[in-house]
Amino acid sequence: MTNLSDQTQQIVPFIRSLLMPTTGPASIPDDTLEKHTLRSETSTYNLTVGDTGSGLIVFFPGFPGSIVGAHYTMQSNGNYKFDQMLLTAQNLPASYNYCRLVSRSLTVRSSTLPGGVYALNGTINAVTFQGSLSELTDVSYNGLMSATANINDKIGNVLVGEGVTVLSLPTSYDLGYVRLGDPIPAIGLDPKMVATCDSSDRPRVYTITAADDYQFSSQYQPGGVTITLFSANIDAITNLSVGGELVFQTSVQGLVLNATIYLVGFDGTTVTTRAVAAGNGLTAGTDNLMPFNLVIPTSEITQPVTSIKLEIVTSKSGGQAGDQMSWLASGNLAVTIHGGNYPGALRPVTLVAYERVATGSVVTVAGVSNFELIPNPELAKNLVTEYGRFDPGAMNYTKLILSERDRLGIKTVWPTREYTDFREYFMEVADLNSPLKIAGAFGFKDIIRAIRRIAVPVVSTLFPPAAPLAHAIGEGVDYLLGDEAGAASGTARAASGKARAASGRIRQLTLAADKGYEVVANLFQVPQNPVVDGILASPGVLRGAHNLDCVLREGATLFPVVITTVEDAMTPKALNSKMFAVIEGVREDLQPPSQRGSFIRTLSGHRVYGYAPDGVLPLETGRDYTVVPIDDVWDDSIMLSKDPIPPIVGNSGNLAIAYMDVFRPKVPIHVAMTGALNAYGEVEKVSFRSTKLATAHRLGLKLAGPGAFDINTGPNWATFIKRFPHNPRDWDRLPYLNLPYLPPSAGRQYHLAMAASEFKETPELESAVRAMEAAADVDPLFQSALSVFMWLEENGIVTDMANFALSDPNAHRMRNFLANAPQAGSKSQRAKYGTAGYGVEARGPTPEEAQREKDTRISKKMEAMGIYFATPEWVALNGHRGPSPGQLKYWQNTREIPDPNEDYLDYVHAEKSRLASEEQILRAATSIYGAPGQAEPPQAFIDEVAKVYEINHGRGPNQEQMKDLLLTAMEMKHRNPRRAPPKPKPKPNAPSQRPPGRLGRWIRTVSDEDLE
């Protein structure tokens, strides 16, 4: 199912090929295991548009062979005319015997213009019909859209320049190979004789029966009288056979019959014919039997066949005008389409219709078909074939994804631009390790995550020897899925986990044990004898076990270490940090090869493996320890890393080693520790704390140690022991103290070519840092420079600033930036940073912090009410909400902590129904219907009010119900003849006439009479 050698991706090749056929073929991971070869075949056609500018392209997206579809042009009379068949570039039967279709996609669009046309016109409708071509009742441009009600199987009015893409999705699974109708050696007199081996499995059979005792009667005509005895719809694009018998009875002497079978295409024209009887004379008074058995090869099926008919031509030897001709007929026939019932062969069909395209334009059909092919004996001499790989995890994942395709937005027909945009989404679906960011934007994330949870555990049932390993990682499946999920304690521990050990490709191991975690804990050891802690093991098998990604289940303490790549002695090129785990004992088999064989001694003479042999570690330990790099942390286990990490140099892990030596925890401590513990019991600060802080946060961990960041545990060992919680339940309740703002670049991972000489945290570097601090106390300018460096380091932009300095050697751009920077107290600074004008940029809480604060508030409120089980972790698992009434009742009755997201409806008493009195209902109906003095409410309205009281269990209507009742009352009043007459509305006063304008005293005004 996946590629275990890839640490970042777990691609399911089959579903990737299904959704994106242009990525190439992939073997179908079912249990049909035959040696085959994979091949991609292209199909490219330039179809010329007819005079009407309309046409139809019929695709058979699931047909297992060279046939892709057919093209029809529309004539002026409104009928379609067959143009040509659409095939793959290579004729597969010429070189291969058997075939299975893996995936197929085709694109239809136009980008050319004929002479004299200056605009690209025309639109496209496309639909996938879950039936055969002959079953379509309306094939017009608009009628096609009614062929299905599924919105994911049709699109309309797509511009012909944009085009549509047809995607083939499987209609069935676990299918066998289909014979292609390949030519076979034939022995005959004619060297042109051709023999083929056609598919015989899954035939489609049509049985056609004539009406009982069909009677024919007519007068003689020169040339005979033609009638159609049989006519029925069939579907065929490959070879077929027709067999049956007819029985004729007549009382007329000298009748002669000619019978012909016609295969009719989709456009109504004849594809091919076969004579059943030629000049057969009927004997009067007896049953005249006419049997037939016809075979029509694929070579004669030049276009899709959609119907069959049997015509009878009746004549009479020596007949004269006016002679009577009559007979009775009965019988039946059967049409067998070889391979016609193979899923995808004849159904479904996809129809792409175009309209109003300029005459003479070219419509391009281009696509790819991916096959599993078994070559013929001649080609097999030079072509290597391989078995397919049975991978039920990949097969089940594909089936589950496609079973939810309507909810996941996976269509069979697409606008080409939309399909291109969805390719990134399809890559997420095919990659089990993807974080589902695009799927989350579309709302499909939860569905795919649920499907992954179902598909991944297949490993446990398929490989029983690997079942202990599958059970050991069971609690961490959510993290293996590559997305954040809540652990048992409510905190997302490892949001970037990789599905490495759950892919169904685990090597079988000769192990025997009662508990899975014992097997896992010892799986990666190389014992001196075959018995390890009572577990019978095979050393030969275990020696190769280090190639597997390990889920280690035992106690450990964690600490981050900074890794740099350097160009010279003091110029770092890139900065990164890695999390390490301290494990008790000598466990070099768990380390990457780059760390093995390297150790450092402690003051007590014990060894710490994984450190470079540089002096003595200033600690006294009671036993040996091993330091291993890790990728992820879960509740009670860690995932080891196989990255080429060099041996460690420096004192960053002293605090974690000392804690491991004193307390010896049984599970991993879910708090990273950093600090250099010296021989006097003092905890010294370490460098690059912001980089280490970002590394801890990426794994969902807090960072403990001296300094004002995350958990300040004091300046000495005694204070650390006093402040650090030793109960695992208290780890998640540790606050994030003074959590700095991490820019987006803080989460970047750098690809480092790491070697032991490149590890930069050395005693010499620490001595240099102390020397710089001493120089800063004397030289103010150097103090400023050191402050700038520490500011860059704490904000995680040292590398970015170093790269900027390389691009600005004379600091011209930096001077311009500083000259134009806002001044202290300016309006822009006050708007951005507040009244101070300077300081750390204000920011609101992150979604995770806000959610955590909400959970804490709900928990404190519940605790004040005496509900002590509602801890912040429980509230988070309960969907970030407090306990429901059912959960409270369950806790009160059983005193057991209820399961989150379980409502316990059995513990909630059903609401008692109260019946309202008739007087109460009448009073409410009268009040709602109208004011006193108006007509009484009709009985129909009283019944409506009674229904509301019944729905509300005796309570009155709510706001929405009151609105509905008022509208009902208004409607009833308008049609009630007994309603009170409406009061007349007062008429507004007529506006006074506008006085004439003020004129001069000597100017005479002109009236209407003067004008007359």
Swiss-Prot record:
InterPro entries per record: Birna_VP2, Birna_VP3, Birna_VP3_dom1, Birna_VP3_dom2, Birna_VP4_Prtase_dom, Viral_coat
Question: In the record, what terms sit under GO molecular function?
Answer: metal ion binding; serine-type peptidase activity; structural molecule activity
Q: What EC number(s) has UniProt assigned to this enzyme?
A: 3.4.21.-
Establish whether keyword Metal-binding is in the entry: yes
> Annotated region Disordered: where?
970-1012
Instruction: Say if the entry is tagged with keyword Protease.
Output: yes
Binding-site residues, a divalent metal cation = D30
Composition bias type Basic residues, residue spans: 975-986
Against PROSITE patterns, the record matches this protein to: BIRNAVIRUS_VP4_PRO (PS51548)
Write out the PTM section of this UniProt entry. Answer: Specific enzymatic cleavages yield mature proteins. The capsid assembly seems to be regulated by polyprotein processing. The protease VP4 cleaves itself off the polyprotein, thus releasing pre-VP2 and VP3 within the infected cell. During capsid assembly, the C-terminus of pre-VP2 is further processed by VP4, giving rise to VP2, the external capsid protein and three small peptides that all stay closely associated with the capsid.
Active site located where?
S652 (nucleophile), K692
Which Pfam family, an example, fits this chain?
Birna_VP2
Task: Write out the ranges of the annotated region (Interaction with VP1 protein).
Answer: 1003-1012
From which domain of life does this come? Viruses
Q: What class of enzyme is it?
A: hydrolase
Record-annotated disulphide pairs: none
Q: Quick one: a GO biological-process term for this protein? A: proteolysis
Q: Quote the cellular component terms of the Gene Ontology held in the record.
A: host cell cytoplasm; T=13 icosahedral viral capsid
The Peptidase S50 domain covers 513-755
Job description of the protein: Capsid protein VP2 self assembles to form an icosahedral capsid with a T=13 symmetry, about 70 nm in diameter, and consisting of 260 VP2 trimers. The capsid encapsulates the genomic dsRNA. VP2 is also involved in attachment and entry into the host cell by interacting with host ITGA4/ITGB1. The precursor of VP2 plays an important role in capsid assembly. First, pre-VP2 and VP2 oligomers assemble to form a procapsid. Then, the pre-VP2 intermediates may be processed into VP2 proteins by proteolytic cleavage mediated by VP4 to obtain the mature virion. The final capsid is composed of pentamers and hexamers but VP2 has a natural tendency to assemble into all-pentameric structures. Therefore pre-VP2 may be required to allow formation of the hexameric structures.
The name under which this protein is listed is Structural polyprotein
